[in-house]
Amino acid sequence: MHDKLLIEGKLIAGNGEALAVFNPATGEQIAAIPQADLHQIDAAVLAAESAFAHWGQTTPKTRATLLLKIADAIEENAEVFAKLESLNCGKPYHAVLNDEVPAVADVFRFFAGAARCLSGSAAGEYLEGHTSMIRRDPVGVVASIAPWNYPLMMASWKLAPALAAGNCVVLKPAEQTPLTTFYLAHLLADILPAGVVNIVFGRGADIGDALTGHEKVNMVSLTGSIATGAHILAHTAASVKRTHMELGGKAPVIVFDDADIDQVVDGIRSFGFYNAGQDCTAACRLYVQRAVYDEVVEALGKAVATLKIGDPRDETTELGPLITEPQLERVMGFVERAKALPHITVVTGGERVKGTGFYFQPTVLAGAKQDDEIVQKEVFGPVISITSFDDEAQVIGWANASNYGLASSVWTRDIGRAHRLAACLQYGCTWVNTHFMLVSEMPHGGQKLSGYGKDMSMYGLEDYTIVRHIMIRH
């Protein structure tokens, strides 16, 4: 098992306290991995700064070629990555192998192509005797903080656009889930020039703060909680660093009475519970028009009850565990408080699964009201709420009455209605008659407390650049 930091092209052991890493499916410890110490954080940032002097000047073709090599290496090691991610996160192995690892490789391939298409505005004479042009240049040293729910995928979302734009990166994976990132470090050491990517490890409260607050870091990119985002913004405010924040979500799923109910049920069964609901875009906050409310509640309850919970190594397993015991207890707390409300009905689930591991039953809670905690707060587990609504105006108001603004979906056969709602919903993405679908070519990111900046797409690449005006007198 790889457990080495990557600093200046060398794989080295951390000099700090060892942190225990667990298998969520069993609750057993699988590794004890030393953190970086503060000297190693400093060395990683300085290595990135030194490498940037050359990497920032390389041609797009050169960067693209190396990104394609990374994609090839990920595909060649797909089974290893899938086994490690499944072991460390409790994800079903087949889902990681067939869904997530190919998507990771595709992100690197997309940004390899995008690197060769990045350009500024056309030159022109806007002042007599002077020619102006726009450059898009790399930011410099980027400190990237990845979350625990999709460790490898989020590492790719952080690394690929930053490298494509010509930046150097110091990446810190979540302390709970470092295994695939360490394996990636082992591969990157043989592909990239020394210092272009550095990978460190440790708790956010000390190692994360040292990294994001380092004076030589030009930009911080985070995928994480609102609390972590707010902390980093406060911590780095004095240095006015550039920041990219992808934070929490509480996706409204709006089901009209003309929707294809079978399609709705199949979709929510998948998109509300993938990765045990530990996804910022999970289809978790259902608003169902009153005429079909009872039908949807009954059908969805029956469908969700068939989700198979089990060993991540079993090809028939659909739902794995939550990431840690504290996360399980957090989800249980949300559900218990909801169950205590007289108007809420547990349609299915609602309990911890007996036995080992951090499993929670897939849960459907009907009768929820707009102001209920279960409707307003991000649970980040296999739990969905269902609320009835009367008309468009009411449901648009309810959907937008949220601190979150990441993802949403509308289910209807009326294309005019779909366009109206898509124009009104205050979310970074609105799907129609589907949910959860992401592609490398399209941007992902939120608004309000869900953050700002875009992952993937050309917009994601541009986020890691600085726009500069060059004016030449002649």
Swiss-Prot record:
InterPro entries: Ald_DH/histidinol_DH (IPR016161), Ald_DH_C (IPR016163), Ald_DH_CS_GLU (IPR029510), Ald_DH_N (IPR016162), Aldehyde_DH_dom (IPR015590), Aminobutyraldehyde_DH (IPR015657), PatD (IPR017749). SUPFAM superfamilies: ALDH-like. One of its GO terms (molecular function) is aminobutyraldehyde dehydrogenase (NAD+) activity. It catalyses: 4-aminobutanal + NAD(+) + H2O = 4-aminobutanoate + NADH + 2 H(+); 5-aminopentanal + NAD(+) + H2O = 5-aminopentanoate + NADH + 2 H(+). GO terms for biological process: L-lysine catabolic process; putrescine catabolic process. It is an enzyme of class 1 (oxidoreductase). This is Gamma-aminobutyraldehyde dehydrogenase.
